[in-house]
UniProtKB/Swiss-Prot annotation:
Organism annotation: Sphingobium indicum (strain DSM 16412 / CCM 7286 / MTCC 6364 / B90A)
GO molecular function, one term: transferase activity
Protein name: 2,5-dichlorohydroquinone reductive dechlorinase
Gene3D superfamilies with a match to the protein in the record: 1.20.1050.10, Glutaredoxin
Entry keyword set: Aromatic hydrocarbons catabolism, Detoxification, Plasmid, Transferase
Alphabetical list of PROSITE patterns matching this protein: GST_CTER (PS50405), GST_NTER (PS50404)
Length: 346
């Protein structure tokens, strides 16, 4: 690993991450209970993430399916803490491959995909590979990297169906999760009451948090530019989530994705999208379907929606160990009355 990458990662871990939020996750200990300072091994992979981030959930699930030990560094990304806005963390992401490859974020579409949004240096997750010195900061790219770099564990990207799996991964990656989280359904807010209570004015709070960090960017034009782009994005988001036509379009797109998923499941000869083989596509859909359920959008496939294949598929996904450990049971997940039955069956 390059000394520069090591220094950047260490500064975030030591100056931003709370000690109790820096833990070691291993195949035989998949909950964040072993403090990093008490661990006897230095992991190859180090993940900076947040419990509730769908992008973080995809990466956590991939790491667990591959059966690797990794360092877990949890950031609190909600205002007023907004630890993902700290200069140390933003500088780490600005050195990532995604920062060099993608245009800076400058708009809001309701998705979290780098392909549609551009690169946002102020979000999660970020993965550091201590063996190669690479810094990866796009969840889809991180998961593909792990699939190609690691031969052990579940073969999430089989060579003979790689392109078909990637097509499904891309579909799941374009789901407008962010819009459905921050914005209400104009025809009746379905989100948990606790979430409805904290969302009004959330983008203004995020912008304030960014502005508090701007003085720390003195002498660092790249960092300053990152903060400026973030403000533009959050201003656009604030307008998007109260625009009824845009919200209806986002909800309609999400429901159509589930309809298309039901069709694709009908072509499968097994429990997963590609027969008996659990792939990265299934993991990405697990994250999407769980978020829909959590938010109150399970009506996309339940309650007379006529999609029994998706309903059965979701139940299988939610029972999979990696999905339970990386998403459903990961400590600190915000409460939702829509998923209590899954937690009680844990």
């Amino acid at each position: 690993m390059s000394a520069d990458t090591e220094t950047l990662a260490r500064k975030v871990r030591e100056e931003v991450i709370k000690p109790e939020q820096s833990t070691l996750i291993s195949p035989d200990r998949q909950s964040p209970s072993l403090l990093r300072r008490e661990a006897t091994v230095e992991p190859r992979f180090e993940l900076f993430h947040f419990v509730f981030s769908v992008c973080s959930q995809k990466v956590r699930g991939t790491l667990m399916e591959k059966g690797v030990t990794f360092g877990s560094n949890e950031l609190t990304i909600l205002p007023p803490q907004s630890e993902n806005y700290c200069p140390q963390y933003v500088r780490l992401r600005l050195r990532s491959e995604a920062a060099a490859k993608h245009r800076p974020v400058s708009s809001f579409t309701g998705q979290s995909s780098v392909d549609s949004e551009g690169f946002d240096p102020l979000v999660v997750p970020t993965l550091v590979d201590h063996e190669t010195g690479r810094i990866l900061a796009d969840s889809k790219a991180i998961c593909l990297y792990l699939c190609d770099a690691l031969s052990g564990g579940t073969d999430l990207l089989p060579a003979d169906i790689r392109e078909a799996v990637l097509k499904q991964v891309q579909l799941a990656d374009t789901t407008p999760h962010v819009a459905l989280l921050y914005g209400a359904d104009p025809d009746g807010d379905r989100r948990p009451e606790s979430m409805q209570a904290v969302m009004p004015g959330i983008h203004a709070h995020k912008i304030d948090a960014v502005r508090r960090n701007i003085p720390l960017a003195d002498g660092d034009p790249l960092l300053l530019e990152a903060y400026q782009h973030k403000i533009v994005k959050e201003e656009a988001a604030a307008s998007f989530v109260i625009n009824e036509p845009q919200m209806r379009t986002a909800i309609s797109k999400a429901e159509q994705l589930v309809t298309d998923l039901d069709r694709d499941l009908g072509a499968s000869t097994g429990p997963w999208l590609f027969g008996d083989r659990f792939t990265l596509a299934d993991l990405f859909w697990a994250v999407s379907l769980y978020r829909f359920l959590w938010l109150g959008y399970s009506g996309f496939w339940k309650d007379g929606a006529g999609k029994p294949r998706v309903e059965a598929y979701a139940n299988r996904l939610f029972a999979r160990p990696s999905v339970k450990d990386a998403i459903i049971q990961w400590p600190g997940h915000p409460p939702s009355e829509n998923v209590i039955h899954l937690l009680s069956n844990a």
